[in-house]
Amino acid sequence: MISVAVNGYGTIGKRVADAILKQPDMRLVGVAKTSPNYEAFIAHRKGIKIYVPQQSIKKFEESGIPVAGTIEDLVKASDIVVDTTPNGVGAQYKPIYQQFQRNAIFQGGEKAEVADISFSALCNYDEALGKKYIRVVSCNTTALLRTICTINKVTKVEKVRATIVRRAADQKEVKKGPINSLVPDPATVPSHHAKDVNSVIKNLDIVTMAVIAPTTLMHMHFINITLKDKVEKKDVLSVLENTPRIVLISSKYDAEATAELVEVARDLKRERNDIPEVMVFDDSVYVKDNEVMLMYAVHQESIVVPENVDAIRASTRLMSAEDSIRITNESLGILKGYLI
């Protein structure tokens, strides 16, 4: 049983903490929070131990939230830390993890240099075995890598061109925008996603462009893949249908808009309406000779959660990729095939 700390209890952190509680081989030591907001109150209500910076102890206690200790205490009590702090903050905490000789999992908002390896479970789990510091790539990069590494099982992927329509903010991020604009992210090519993919697949020819859209629900990707050999559409659909963490969306559902997919998640009683699987629209899959085009939706709040769980096992050499992915999927109810 591995003891896991989660530093940060926001959009990703609370989902990772809940996922750890569902693993048969992990124990959640507690979570770190810096302010006593509603998320801290909910964590306390769930019985999760809360650790805070030394200077914040009084503020939490005055709010009625008992404190289990400092963030340093949390790190010392754990075998490994999943750092889900805001972009760039994880690198500031790394010296603490090093001080106590603890392994750590970082998120895609950190620079790749913060870790020994960037990670995507379906692509390079074995390369991450025993690595002390692992960086789980961002939500968009996770989706790109899952898709690319899956199609690579049909025949070698030689080139990728992708356009990413990014959500402007998570649903709780009320101070972010835009509200009525499309914003190039950036107006230069490539966007950072290509470099991020290359941090996992070193020599892949990939170019990405991105734009921010006024929505909070999901991202959308439109990708063009050039393969080494000619393929049939049925082979591409088959590998997508039979790969875990990817689901197909059929037009017969009459639910292709991201808002409709969120409603599907509600009706399926998904926790927090999460869909951690890449959602590929099956009618969008186009194949001609060695060229494949497709579009899919990405739920940015949950897609990296199973990757974090697998990264814990890879870092601590708990088990093989196949076993870890299977246990994670089963414990979190993650599907393959068609969503409905």
Swiss-Prot record:
Subcellular location as annotated: Cytoplasm
Pathway involvement of the protein, from the record: Carbohydrate degradation; glycolysis; pyruvate from D-glyceraldehyde 3-phosphate: step 1/5
Class of the enzyme per the UniProt entry, highest EC level: oxidoreductase
PROSITE patterns to which the protein is assigned, alphabetical: GAPDH
UniProt: D-glyceraldehyde 3-phosphate binding residues: S138, C139, N140, H193, A194
EC code(s) of this entry: 1.2.1.59
Chain residues that bind NAD(+): T11, I12, G109, R167, Q300
SMART domains linked: Gp_dh_N (SM00846)
Pfam families the UniProt entry points to: DapB_N, Gp_dh_C
Catalytic residues (positions): C139 (nucleophile)
Assembly and oligomerization: Homotetramer.
Protein family membership: Belongs to the glyceraldehyde-3-phosphate dehydrogenase family.
Name of the protein: Glyceraldehyde-3-phosphate dehydrogenase
Organism: Saccharolobus islandicus (strain M.16.27)
Gene: gap
